[in-house]
């Protein structure tokens, strides 16, 4: 969860404030300058507005963070007051991110309850994230595949 530590300051620009906070923490832990640079660079480049897989660690972080969609992320218990983000997350009853045995494809496999949210709603919210996942996978010399309800979409 270190990558989102900047959210304690504000959601806006949390990647940059988080990178600064992580620098202090890692420096106080006597991490090597090379490790600190790699980690804070990944943290500073993981948010949608500024994300870019500048190194393999950043690419892995982007894949993990942007593919994190699941019902348990929704804290609001009143389904009648859900916004589209709540609906999309709540609709995901199963989520799995995996790499094939040949290490050529990273696949995000989702099961979505279409009574709660349509696949189109998912794309309305997460298309940008899926594009970032594809770029991150490419940085790791992988192809990104998205499968929703058994249908390969990317």
Language model feature labels by segment:
Residues 71-154:
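Terminal helices and disordered tails flanking the catalytic cores of nucleotide-processing hydrolases
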């Amino acid at each position: 969860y270190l990558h989102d530590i900047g959210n304690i300051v504000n959601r806006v620009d949390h990647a940059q404030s988080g990178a600064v906070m992580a620098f202090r923490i890692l420096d106080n832990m006597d991490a090597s300058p090379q490790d600190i640079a790699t980690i804070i660079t990944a943290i500073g480049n993981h948010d949608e507005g500024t994300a870019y897989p500048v190194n393999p660690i950043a690419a892995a972080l982007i894949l993990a963070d942007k593919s994190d969609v699941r019902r348990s992320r929704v804290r609001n218990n009143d389904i009648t007051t859900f916004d589209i983000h709540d609906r999309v997350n709540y609709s995901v009853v199963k989520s799995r991110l995996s790499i094939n045995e040949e290490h050529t494809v990273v696949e995000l496999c989702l099961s979505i309850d279409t009574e709660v949210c349509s696949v189109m709603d998912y794309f309305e919210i997460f298309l940008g994230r899926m594009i970032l996942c594809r770029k991150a996978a490419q940085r790791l010399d992988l192809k990104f595949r998205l499968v929703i309800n058994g249908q390969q979409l990317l």
